[in-house]
């Protein structure tokens, strides 16, 4: 009896404990349920997150914006297109020292009517002939007919010391090169209201050959943003003559001006290269630029640079053929190397 009665009491006690546990569990469950957001609260939370993301996106895109603008496309045939700009203060302060060479306004221009396609074709032949004698191991090769510098591997050689050069550069090449340089110089003077005699050819002036080959040296990395006046102290006006067509002879490789508008906004202004197209611009910070990386094909162009400072002026290149002709007239011979100006 005592064992049985004890057992009954024990069962009752256990039963009582179970009720307490269930009560505590129920209380705990109720407490947990009260801390979980309701469906309405969750919707409000997500709405706030979406709103904050939207506001952040609006602030970003109105504060940090890069617009794109096409200044000249490959399909267009342009008589003349210009874009005036305010001169950067350092550029204006320096160029104001040179009477007859102060632009009426800084800016840029592009024209397809300065150089003929036939002239561009002859210069393209000259470039290809020169680059047969040497090319960079990376994607950017240069040929400077004034200094004789020619990319070869990871270094430069003097093209006029190569015997083959005399056979490649013809009288037609030379005459067209000089004639085109004079026409481009006149175009710069006309567009910026300069005295053409106050404008002088300067170094470096060179042919370029760009491909998608991986860069091997810093000289192959042509795509970095820069200001010509900061890179080359002698520059006051920069021009480019394109010898091949964007979208036909090569892809990528567009010329890009970078116009900064305020602290964070900028506009990329594109020129699509076209055979015989000439672009020109003042060389100060108002015309920061770069060239897109070429993704296929070969891009040929000539950079023709001008200065207002006679100290940095250089003469037209004196080719080996000229020396040979002079040597024959004098009854002598020479080594066929370029004479320094």
Describe each PLM feature range.
Residues 2-341:
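Fe(II)/2-oxoglutarate oxygenase catalytic core
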